[in-house]
Amino acid sequence: MKAYLDLLSHVLNNGTDRSDRTGVGTRSVFGYQMRFNLQEGFPLLTTKKLHLRSIIYELLWFLKGDTNIAWLKEHGVSIWDEWADKDGNLGPVYGYQWRSWPSSDGRYIDQISNLLAMINHNPNSRRLIVTAWNPALIDEMALPPCHCLFQFQVANGKLSCQLYQRSADIFLGVPFNIASYALLTMMIAQVTGLKVGDFIHTLGDAHLYSNHFEQAKQQLSRTPGILPLIRINPKVTDLFSFQFEDFELLNYEAQPHIKAPVAV
């Protein structure tokens, strides 16, 4: 994951110090891109241990169209707790926009199902896009979408994905986002009969919170290891039928976790 460490180093050494919504303060750059060849391994950080369980359950939760944290908490995942209201609701966040985008004529658009249909029937389309950025509903969301738009391309029998992330917490959030969208690409490739290509991660405001500087330096002092592999149950042919048990992480040798506070 040299590409990720290069990002950390670039922001730490070349970023601009700015104030932000949380009051913590950040060092940021505007516009940055990383590329990962998914045939070379699963892009899960080895320079600090990540909680893959949370990544998988969050992705399955998005795909369910759920926007309440109850299901996540049932499975021991707490990454959305800080933003939920007393009933566990988050408003019309990712899952709602992915699966039930409300149209002006009263319909609800299932962007994920539409995406799968287009990949299967018109793989050369340049419209293989899903967006979570709905301006009409931003104010109703507990947190506006950070990873807000992704696009797929099919070429030479391979499926590639590019994510645009408007706001990127590079120490805590970005490693999760890389793994999540890489896994989503692998899942969609499997159910559409394709091989995996690249995951391209394009960042808008790429920032390191001021209380993450020392943790970033600690991580940069570590040498990355060989990427792990992830085995997906080959019997699953429906994207919405995947369960946590359908994923097996292989050969993951990571250095110890590095704690850092979440900016809310």
From Swiss-Prot:
Bridged cysteine pairs (disulfide): none
Enzyme class, broadest EC rank: transferase
Catalytic activity: dUMP + (6R)-5,10-methylene-5,6,7,8-tetrahydrofolate = 7,8-dihydrofolate + dTMP
UniProt feature coiled coil, ranges: none
UniProt GO MF annotations: thymidylate synthase activity
Subcellular location: Cytoplasm
UniProt GO cellular component terms: cytosol
EC number: 2.1.1.45
Keywords: Cytoplasm, Methyltransferase, Nucleotide biosynthesis, Transferase
Residues the entry annotates as binding dUMP: R21, R126, R127, R166, S167, A168, D169, N177, H207, L208, Y209
InterPro entries: Thymidate_synth/dCMP_Mease, Thymidate_synth/dCMP_Mease_dom, Thymidate_synth/dCMP_Mease_sf, Thymidylate_synthase, Thymidylate_synthase_AS
Active-site feature positions: C146
Pathway where this protein functions: Pyrimidine metabolism; dTTP biosynthesis
Residues involved in (6R)-5,10-methylene-5,6,7,8-tetrahydrofolate binding: H51, D169, A263
One BP term from GO: dTMP biosynthetic process
Subunit organization: Homodimer.
The family this protein is said to belong to: Belongs to the thymidylate synthase family. Bacterial-type ThyA subfamily.
Protein name from the UniProt record: Thymidylate synthase
The species this protein was found in: Bartonella bacilliformis (strain ATCC 35685 / KC583 / Herrer 020/F12,63)
